[in-house]
């Protein structure tokens, strides 16, 4: 599930007060169990593959007919859209040579985690006074912290390649009513060095807007279906070519309770998606909780990275940032 769907599913487990909600619907009885053998699984897989093949065939024929009709009635605009989509697919599916960071260069299979929190009003205020969004302030904070971390290591990284989830909720063809994942991942270089806070926020805003407008971003599902044709080493190289994965998810603005106990924090600890580091933020009850997941081979000094990220958020928001070990 994507971040917003995860929050929605989590809300089903919690109450808005210490006492149970008497009006809450009673869960349905579990379905009766059925014995399932190898033959049943094989038939189910075969039926699913046949349905998928039929859907692809129908979509292909429909698309070809629409294109042929458009070529006759609106030749220039039809071919213009086709060319725009093809070039967009090339940009979105391009495989970079490697990460841009000269420090976060290793990749492994073990991870460590860190966390801290920031007053949400401070982040929202920093964005609002510039006419920008909370996500712009979040991205600028990450950039400031990553710049400080690289300078700690005696290097200046002008840009870092970031993975940024682009929400497709509310778009034409929105799948959120049928699927728990309605995002596509944009991957692009983001400036981190030599810019002021205002410039970093403006750059983040423009970059995310630019990639959200890419036609291929909305083709994530069909592109994923044909990804099995791509050699595994190429897919692995593409995944490891990013330095940082970021994610910002709005959570409930009021306190939640579980079995009468108040939830005091909501730290997101998320997979790196091949990058060296994942930095995610979830807002909850007036605070912004930041979780940091790091690849052990890429980052051997997580405590230093967390301190530099805390400094980055403090610089952008002008507010005191919570300690790194508040709930340790």
PLM features: residue spans?
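Soluble acyl-CoA-dependent acyltransferase catalytic core bearing the H(X)4D motif
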Residues: 1-275, 279-310, 314-328
